[in-house]
Amino acid sequence: MPSYGSLHSPSLRKMEHSRGQYGGGRKGMSLGNVIGDPFALATISIAGLAWLIAFIASIVAQIQTTQGFPTYTWWTVVFYFFLIPGVFVVVASDTIQTYHVALVGYMACGLVLTTSSVNGLVYSTNGAKEAAAAGFILLSMVTIVWIFYFGSAPSAMPRAYLDSFALSKESTSNNRQTMTGGGYGIGRPETSTSVQPPQMYTSAQLNGFENPSPVNGMRNSGAPPSGFPTTPGPASGLPKTTTPPAGGAADAEIVPPTEYPYRAKAIYTYEANPDDANEISFSKHEILEVSDVSGRWWQARKETGETGIAPSNYLILL
């Protein structure tokens, strides 16, 4: 098992190749992403029912009143005929973070259409028009909720709370044990943050830069600094460097950070990969200390003192 900080550790491979792996594989549609998400299932079902009420009532109202029926209402019906299935496809394919901006734009247009249709139908004495207005009112309410949800960042507290009820997101940590080799991160929830991790140096690379003498001793001594040669010669006073043998760099250790200036809260339960000693497990709502918030994997420390890396999309900063 690779030791902590080993250059061949799976954790470091995940951190170094996070940019290439992000979005590297396309996911197919899964009905479980909708059924396992109570928020998506409820809102899509209500929107579909509201559209059906508005559609049938508009047909009846058009037949009963040949004149005076607002024709732009039909454009609202057609618009939501494509918008509601579009939301279903995005949620089922787990590509919310990819298309959430487009969804919010279309939903904003749909909200204008539904409210205009309500204004043209709700004041009528015809029962069919009032039923159509009720359907459009329900569509408007669902659209407002959708705009707030899809327009919020995944780390926003209301959205994180709603996502905590999704079974598909909770089961992601259980499925990642079946992944091997370069497939790390393919089955995990995607995040919009993908920053190259900071450069890390090994002890072999830093050899020769240490100063073994105290600063005061150097000032009081009449001898020249150790970094300068005292007699002519080929690099007599230069710091000595050691070339590690073949394979030696692979086992070089990286000292873990000692400062953890950030605090993060776990929004999901995570089980560490048993094949990677650098990962740590944590439970939902557990508070962790984080040293670096760049990249998809964060260096974290638990309250028990255990340190390791944790996926950033399972945490929110406090």
UniProtKB/Swiss-Prot annotation:
Record keywords, A-Z: Cell membrane, Membrane, SH3 domain, Stress response, Transmembrane, Transmembrane helix, Virulence
Effect of deleting the gene: Reduces only slightly appressorium formation and virulence.
Compartments, record wording: Cell membrane
SH3 domain: residues covered: 259-318
Annotated region (Disordered), positions in chain: 1-23, 172-255
UniProt biased composition (Polar residues): 190-214
Transmembrane segments: 39-59, 72-92, 101-121, 131-151
Low complexity bias (residue ranges): 237-250
Cytoplasmic side: 1-38, 93-100, 152-318
InterPro entries: SH3-like_dom_sf, SH3_domain, Sho1_SH3
Residues in the signal sequence: none
Domain of life: Eukaryota
Its membrane topology: Multi-pass membrane protein
Membrane topology (Extracellular): 60-71, 122-130
Primary location group: membrane
Induction: Expression is significantly reduced when PMK1 is disrupted.
GO cellular component: plasma membrane
UniProt keyword annotation of Membrane present: yes
Pfam family, one: SH3_1
Protein's job: MSB2 and SHO1 have overlapping functions in recognizing various surface signals for MAPK PMK1 activation and appressorium formation. While MSB2 is critical for sensing surface hydrophobicity and cutin monomers, SHO1 may play a more important role in recognizing rice leaf waxes.
Subunit note: Forms homooligomers.
Similarity section: Belongs to the SHO1 family.
Protein name: Cell surface sensor SHO1
